[in-house]
Amino acid sequence: MLEHSLRTGVPTAEKVLAGGVWGYLSSNPEASRIFDEAMTSKAYGQVAGVVEAYDFSVFRVIGDIGGGRGHLLQRVLMSAPAARGVLFDQQHVVEQASGVRSDRLTLQAGDFFKGDLPVCDAYLLMEVIHDWNDQDATKILRNVRSAAPAHSKLLIIEAIIADDPGLSWPKTLDLWMLAIGGKQRTCQEYAELFANAGFSFTRQIDTQAGVSIIEGIPA
């Protein structure tokens, strides 16, 4: 079915699933549960690499946007003992994450396409933006920007496509993402997304876990 996407540019998921991948998951709780568990398991090694590569202790309030069951935010808060965290995701996802709630970690249900995001010092989006095309990704980031204080930082965590012609895992993943309507991006493409959404790119921090942290600040 990938051939359909390669030939037409139209996500295969929209052809075989009503509402595409995300519409299907939102209306099928069991499928959503399995998907969230799979993403949590896959991300364990990546999360360790992210926490090792970045100093989160400088933030007071850290928002994990589209954070699933909170595995990233939990580890980040362990590395930043003075910080509080806000886990932001759709209602059906947040309900499955109730076990991570604590005096330092609160849950907020919402839709990042509609806004109403929490006010934080740092916004984490781990493997969220690659799920969406440029138009939708820009809309998400603009909604983050609407909530973001002037001093805050935006931290996008993704596998980045290098500017070279060689084979790589991010390029292979890019084909998979095509089937659901998303894409992997180069650092320059993220910088352009940032600019279109009201952020300025500051730096790329590579980790030992196959993902990079793309940092930005409000423009």
Task: Give the predicted meaning of each segment.
Residues 52, 56-219:
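Alpha-helical subdomain
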